[in-house]
């Protein structure tokens, strides 16, 4: 009723013009000062601010959706050039690392966001289309919906506001590849192992056929090599007569069985 009787929308006060044009705003004494409590510069949003770093108002470029964690501690040195938000807003705080990593946070007054992991899962575009080959092993969400009968016939008057599902018939493009199924990975590993074994066996056959040294070896040399390998494999501990204790310098016992002290070698000198 007041707007009909005495409308003042067409009136402009001098104070409003002064605030919009930033009249009387003095430049900063030196650049880089903290301007977290100042208003946003209207001329900078229009790319018409000529004060630069000496402007007493904040220069915000673009939409900053996350609060600067260094600014919360008073350690951010970028000022207006920081790509994060210099404003304490609970809805734009960074995500809590402990809650996202372990599913719980012991800090009752944690200032960071606790986001439910299930809310991060995206809907599977293949399942929404009709079929997903990964089934329950798919990393995306499979949500059961009722298909709109009118949309299947050809037209639905509700459009995007319809409570039923309007399936998409085009192939989803640009989606991340799904991890392979466990059976597929096992089959691939078996195939790779078989290929490696075949290659190694073929190489052994080629070397045995082409090496002249193996053909020139006599059975006597082969027998000597077998005896040497057998003696090395069955080699037992040395006799005590050949053992020298490094503590006392005497023969006949090991150092761990020596009854003398660790300075016994000095008495021998």
From Swiss-Prot:
SMART domains: ZnF_C2HC, ZnF_C3H1. Residues 183-197 have a biased composition (Low complexity). A zinc finger (C3H1-type) spans 35-61, 62-89, 90-117, 118-145, 146-169. It is found in: Nucleus. InterPro entries: CPSF4/Yth1, Znf-CCCH_3, Znf_CCCH, Znf_CCCH_sf, Znf_CCHC, Znf_CCHC_sf. Keywords: Metal-binding, mRNA processing, Nucleus, Repeat, RNA-binding, Zinc, Zinc-finger. One of its GO terms (cellular component) is mRNA cleavage and polyadenylation specificity factor complex. One of its GO terms (biological process) is mRNA processing. GO terms for molecular function: RNA binding; zinc ion binding. Its main location: nucleus. It holds the Pfam family zf-CCCH_3. The keyword RNA-binding applies. A zinc finger (CCHC-type) spans 243-260. PROSITE patterns: ZF_C3H1, ZF_CCHC. The keyword Endoplasmic reticulum does not apply. Residues 173-197 are annotated as: Disordered. Component of the cleavage and polyadenylation specificity factor (CPSF) complex, composed of cpsf1, cpsf2, cpsf3, cpsf4 and fip1l1. Component of the cleavage and polyadenylation specificity factor (CPSF) complex that play a key role in pre-mRNA 3'-end formation, recognizing the AAUAAA signal sequence and interacting with poly(A) polymerase and other factors to bring about cleavage and poly(A) addition. Cpsf4 binds RNA polymers with a preference for poly(U). PANTHER family: CLEAVAGE AND POLYADENYLATION SPECIFICITY FACTOR SUBUNIT 4, CLEAVAGE AND POLYADENYLATION SPECIFICITY FACTOR SUBUNIT 4-RELATED. Belongs to the CPSF4/YTH1 family. This is Cleavage and polyadenylation specificity factor subunit 4. It comes from Xenopus laevis. The gene is cpsf4.
């Amino acid at each position: 009723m007041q707007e009909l009787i005495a409308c003042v929308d067409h009136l402009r006060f001098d104070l409003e013009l002064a605030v919009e044009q930033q009249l009387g705003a003095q430049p900063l004494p030196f650049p880089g000062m903290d301007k977290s409590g100042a208003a946003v510069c209207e001329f900078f949003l229009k790319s018409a601010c000529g004060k630069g770093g000496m402007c007493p108002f904040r220069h915000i470029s673009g939409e900053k959706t996350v609060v600067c964690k260094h600014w919360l501690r008073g350690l951010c040195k970028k000022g207006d050039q920081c790509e994060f938000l210099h404003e304490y807003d609970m809805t734009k705080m960074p995500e809590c690392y402990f809650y996202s990593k372990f599913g719980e946070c012991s800090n009752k007054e944690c200032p960071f966001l606790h986001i439910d992991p299930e809310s991060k899962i995206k809907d599977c575009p293949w399942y929404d289309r009709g079929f997903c080959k990964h089934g329950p092993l798919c990393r995306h969400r499979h949500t059961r919906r009722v298909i709109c009968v009118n949309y299947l016939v050809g037209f639905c008057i509700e459009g995007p506001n319809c409570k039923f599902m309007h399936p998409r018939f085009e192939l989803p493009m640009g989606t991340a590849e799904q991890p392979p199924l466990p059976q597929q990975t096992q089959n691939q590993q078996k195939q790779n192992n078989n290929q490696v074994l075949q290659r190694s066996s073929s190489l052994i056959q080629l070397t045995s056929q082409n090496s002249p040294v193996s053909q020139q070896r006599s059975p006597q040399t082969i027998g000597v090599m077998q005896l040497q390998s057998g003696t090395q494999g069955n080699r037992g501990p040395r006799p005590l007569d050949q053992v020298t204790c490094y503590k006392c310098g005497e023969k006949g016992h090991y150092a761990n069985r020596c009854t003398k002290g660790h300075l016994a070698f000095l008495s021998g000198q």
